[in-house]
Amino acid sequence: MKKTAISLMLAALLPAMNAYAEQGDWVVRLRATNISPNESSDLGKYVNKNVANVMSNGAELKLDNNTIPELDISYYWTKNIATELILALGSKHDVSVAKEPGSVVPNQKLGSIDALPPTLTVQWHFNPDQTFDPYVGAGINATFMLDRTLTLNQSSVGALQGSKIKIDRDSFGPALQAGLDVNLKDGWLLNADVKYLWIDTDVKLRNPLAGNSWTKIDSLDVNPWVISLGIGKRF
């Protein structure tokens, strides 16, 4: 009788147990994602060399952070191996000219750009049949510059003031990823995820000193950290 009661209790608990990953599963996640550029820029050096000596050599381009909604879809080839496609909406970033570190001169805004950064990664899940499932991943990122025109509006640049600047090309590069799924009941899960994306592009100026031809004024590495928190559903 006692064994029967225990069996009935276990059977009653089974439907409430957490759902874990299996081969052939699809997972859809909705996350809040912060994109934090880790940029590297030599704007001042390029402008002074290629256009005119009107900037400090330490001047550089800076992009601000942005938080956006992000949808991703994963497919499990095995219970450990999954492919994830990140479908973030366009991310808008203000672009400014910054002086040398420690300068009292404030950053001077040039405008904003919109970037669309879909990313495809292959993941290894360490504990797919447990509540806490950490994973790592690697893949490729494609960043498409949707709104890429800026204006050099500083009076200190003389004849270059008012000149148009453009982000010249889209970017394709590697991506690394680490994260954690917390498996809940009925296929639901919580997710925390960190990515590092290699994004590089050229920046050009419509040069009034050279017949308004486009002149390269920077080789910009954006290289953002992408940090996400959200929920997901397994199907």
Which positions does each model-derived feature cover?
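Positively charged n-region of N-terminal signal peptides that target proteins for export
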Residues: 1-5
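Bacterial N-terminal signal peptides
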Residues: 7-15
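Sec/Tat signal peptide C-region and signal peptidase I cleavage site
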Residues: 17-21
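Transmembrane beta-strand segments of Gram-negative outer membrane beta-barrel proteins
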Residues: 22-36
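Residues on the lipid-exposed face of transmembrane beta-strands in outer-membrane beta-barrel proteins
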Residues: 30, 71-75, 85, 120-124, ...
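Extracellular/periplasm-exposed beta-strand and loop segments of Gram-negative cell-envelope proteins
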Residues: 36-67, 88-117, 143-171, 199-226
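Repeated loop/turn-to-beta-strand initiation elements of outer-membrane beta-barrel proteins
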Residues: 80-83, 130-132, 188-190
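Short, structured loop/turn "capping" segments at alpha-beta junctions
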Residues: 129-134, 149
